[in-house]
């Protein structure tokens, strides 16, 4: 597993395009990009979020994020909980996960 860390995407996932993040061509779903706060991909809590979330889910890696102060906590709480590497997550998409606190 490879781990890459970034933060403050605020719903703008252009940094994960292949031309910006060329290392992804050798990554798999076992590799993780961790967004450390202010993910912003679940902002509206409806279909307006789909394009960005579907883009991330289509990448060859898994995106995990920790919520920040700019999140829609009510919308995030509506996603199902699961266990991932011994911790609780919210499954936003099969390969887009919110790491639960606590």
Kindly give the residue locations of the regions a language model identified.
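Core catalytic region of metal-dependent phosphoesterases/phosphodiesterases
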Residues: 6, 12-102
């Amino acid at each position: 597993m490879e781990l890459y860390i970034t933060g403050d995407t605020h719903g703008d996932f252009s940094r994960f395009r292949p031309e910006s993040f060329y290392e992804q061509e050798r990554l798999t779903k076992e590799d993780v990009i961790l967004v450390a706060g202010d993910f912003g991909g679940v902002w509206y809590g409806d279909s307006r979020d789909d394009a960005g979330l579907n883009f991330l889910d289509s990448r060859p890696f898994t995106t995990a994020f920790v919520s920040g102060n700019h999140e829609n906590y009510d919308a995030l709480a509506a996603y199902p909980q699961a266990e991932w590497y011994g911790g609780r997550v919210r499954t936003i998409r099969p390969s887009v996960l919110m790491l639960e606190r606590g």
